[in-house]
């Protein structure tokens, strides 16, 4: 459901991390690092971009575009390597900016709405399946919890937008939130999207139909497929080329 991160890409990353003895392909990150190793200028562009603490989304966008221009101007790199590096720089820049912006967004919403948003540093997990001797779980950390005066908890997910407010929840964001709701045993969530000084809050409820018919079967299938591939022996060719 996430157009920006295909299933094969996620599978490769998990495969390499937890079953390195059978993984002989290359993850997208591996390919980007190989391309970066060919160019000192590209490495400098990435380092400089990550050191910029953008004050808002517009500045973060300008920072990435400046790095992109430097990479595109590097004639020592082929077009394919340039694109691998640009994708990597984009991901690193926007992820870093989103993490840095999270506190400001939470403080702004708390002040404007009079709500209590509590940071939760715990790592939550949800058991999915056991295949052979391997247990498969989904684990993650949430952004905030909103605590009402009566003590009721609402999950809060904060998203930094780079080009404007969506005013809606993307399917892949809803899947993430539904998984967190099941991990924590909660029924309600809020997605707070932020772009520069603007914020928008979208309320989301636990969707059991989506969970039963789409998300849970998808998790079971993913775990089964990953186990089958990771335990059959070394790859004969890069996993990323497998059809999904």
Each PLM stretch: what is its role?
Residues 1-244:
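Accessory terminal regions of nucleic-acid processing enzymes
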């Amino acid at each position: 459901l996430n157009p920006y991160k295909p299933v094969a890409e996620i599978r490769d990353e998990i495969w390499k991390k937890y079953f390195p003895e059978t993984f002989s392909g290359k993850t997208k990150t591996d390919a980007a690092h190989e391309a970066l190793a060919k160019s000192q200028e590209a490495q400098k562009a990435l380092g400089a971009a990550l050191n910029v603490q953008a004050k808002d989304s517009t500045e973060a966008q300008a920072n990435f575009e400046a790095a992109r221009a430097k990479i595109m101007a590097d004639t020592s790199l082929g077009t394919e390597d340039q694109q691998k590096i640009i994708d990597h720089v984009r991901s690193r820049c926007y992820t870093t900016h989103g993490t840095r912006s999270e506190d400001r967004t939470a403080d702004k919403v708390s002040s404007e709405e009079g709500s209590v948003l509590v940071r939760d540093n715990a790592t939550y997990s949800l058991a999915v399946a056991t295949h052979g001797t391997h247990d498969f779980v989904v684990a993650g950390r949430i952004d905030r919890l909103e605590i009402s005066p009566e003590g009721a908890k609402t999950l809060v997910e904060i998203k930094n937008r780079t080009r404007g407010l969506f005013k809606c929840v993307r399917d892949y964001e809803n899947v993430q939130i539904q998984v967190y709701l099941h991990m924590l045993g909660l029924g309600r969530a809020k997605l707070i999207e932020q772009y520069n000084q603007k914020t928008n809050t979208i309320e989301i409820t636990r969707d059991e139909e989506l969970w039963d018919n789409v998300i849970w079967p998808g998790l079971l299938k993913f775990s089964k497929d990953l186990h089958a591939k990771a335990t059959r022996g070394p790859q004969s060719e890069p996993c990323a080329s497998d059809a999904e």
